[in-house]
Amino acid sequence: LGAGMSGGLIHVAGDCGDSAGGLIAGKRFGMTGGTIVIDGSAAARTAEKMRRGTIIVRGATGAMAGVRMLGGTIVAEGGVGPDAGRLMRRGTILASRLIAGADIPATFADCGVHDLVILRIMARNWTRELGPLAPRFTPHVVRRYAGDLATIGKGELLLPA
């Protein structure tokens, strides 16, 4: 779903399978723009090698959400599964929690608690652009984990403080 997407909006009224917004065979990148809103949960490898765009998941993501991510944003209102952000270069994963069995990857650095103004700006923009499809979960005070430090480490995993 949305593999290779470069713009527009996809709204899924239920759950989604593997690789939403992810890599398509023969391409260098997954999603390169646009927005995907999934009302249910998303399976493994959501946003694999995503370059830009936004994926909003009302439920939880499966294992390896944002694996090898190059940019863009994932909002996981139900939480993220194991290995979220593994080998992420840039991008943001905003999650409500880590689901059972998931840990912060060892190659992510705890950067402390922050009140990020950009989250307010993003929430306002999503509300204006998406209306009722906008994320319902947008905390302003978050604990920021930078990574993946096994690569260039410019990505981030944000969890409520």
For the regions a protein language model found, what residue spans apply to each?
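Intrinsically disordered, low-complexity terminal regions
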Residues: 11-13, 17, 26-39, 43-45, ...
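Hydrophobic packing positions in regular secondary-structure scaffolds
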Residues: 20-21
